[in-house]
């Protein structure tokens, strides 16, 4: 699957940044729930491992997930719940283990049946959706790492995977919050990193979002408040969408408050 290569390349960009910065950067706090970069890498490693386990079928995913989920149900945060699983692995060893998990995910998914149903923390999904979700999470958590280190990421057109996730989650964003789905669905016209123009939905819609694909992806993955972007947002449906946008599964999560997520040094 092409999405497996996109996931690998996204992970590679993050890996190269961390190698350039050195292991000392792992103690740096990010603007995401005050997680350190080491927390972020542990989180990505954990869920990469889970992605490989779920593709094996049977009880593999359940055996991996139950001890972690039990801790979350007992009130622990995901970062706290991952500590026993990581079993004391930190620093360079964590970086090595995370990178090995990236290669394992890529090798498992590159030739997998895209339509195979796999388990996750929520409803079952296709293998294609699972690897796309791994790409999304790597990019989104990578954003807080690049931000914390004051570095710019060279964006690529593979971000289209994330934009598409955001687009198809339009209705679910509101249903998940027990809100009515506003009509009409907004028309999107977004500039890709390559300069291509991407469009979604009916161009005759009275509600519209224009801008860069990167900023749209930042909003739907909740790494930026829409008010901190240059997106042009027209019509009530588009405004409401950008207020609540959430392309990832799980209970409703509130986007970051205005001005709380940015690149250090800006």
For each of these PLM feature ranges, what is it?
Residues 4-7, 95-98, 131-134:
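Hydrophobic packing residues in well-ordered alpha-helices of helical domains and bundles
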Residues 1-2, 50-110, 158-159:
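Short, helix-capping/interhelical loops that line the mouth of catalytic, cofactor-
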Residues 205-266:
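C-terminal interaction segments
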Residues 1, 5-34, 39-42:
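Basic, Lys/Arg-rich alpha-helical nucleic-acid-recognition elements, primarily the DNA-binding modules
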Residues 178-220:
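Glycine/small-residue-rich hydrophobic helix-like segments
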Residues 12-19, 48-52, 99-110, 139-146:
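Structural signal for well-ordered, non-membrane alpha-helices
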Residues 18-30, 102-131:
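Acidic interhelical loop/turn segments
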Residues 26-71, 120-176, 216:
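Short, contiguous alpha-helical
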């Amino acid at each position: 699957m092409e999405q497996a290569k996109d996931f690998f390349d996204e992970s590679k960009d993050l890996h190269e940044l961390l190698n350039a910065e050195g292991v000392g950067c792992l103690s740096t706090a990010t603007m995401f729930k005050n997680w350190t970069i080491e927390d972020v890498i542990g989180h990505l490693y954990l869920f990469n491992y889970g992605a490989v386990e779920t593709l094996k079928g049977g009880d593999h995913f359940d055996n991996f997930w139950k001890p972690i989920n039990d801790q979350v149900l007992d009130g622990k945060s995901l970062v706290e719940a991952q500590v026993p699983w990581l079993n004391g692995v930190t620093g360079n060893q964590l970086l090595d283990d995370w990178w090995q998990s990236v290669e394992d995910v890529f090798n498992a998914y590159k030739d997998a049946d895209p339509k195979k149903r796999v388990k996750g923390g929520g409803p079952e999904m296709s293998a294609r959706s699972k690897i796309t979700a791994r790409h999304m999470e790597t990019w989104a958590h990578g954003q807080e790492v690049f931000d914390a280190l004051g570095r710019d990421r060279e964006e690529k057109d593979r971000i289209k995977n994330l934009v598409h996730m955001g687009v198809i989650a339009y209705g679910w964003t509101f249903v998940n919050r027990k809100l009515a789905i506003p009509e009409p669905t907004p028309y999107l016209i977004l500039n890709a990193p390559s300069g291509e123009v991407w469009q979604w939905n009916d161009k005759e819609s009275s509600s519209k979002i224009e801008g860069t694909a990167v900023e749209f992806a930042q909003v739907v993955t909740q790494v930026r408040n829409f008010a901190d972007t240059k997106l042009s947002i027209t019509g009530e449906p588009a405004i409401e969408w950008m207020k609540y946008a959430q392309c990832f599964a799980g209970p409703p999560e509130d986007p970051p408050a205005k001005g709380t997520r940015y690149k250090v040094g800006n």
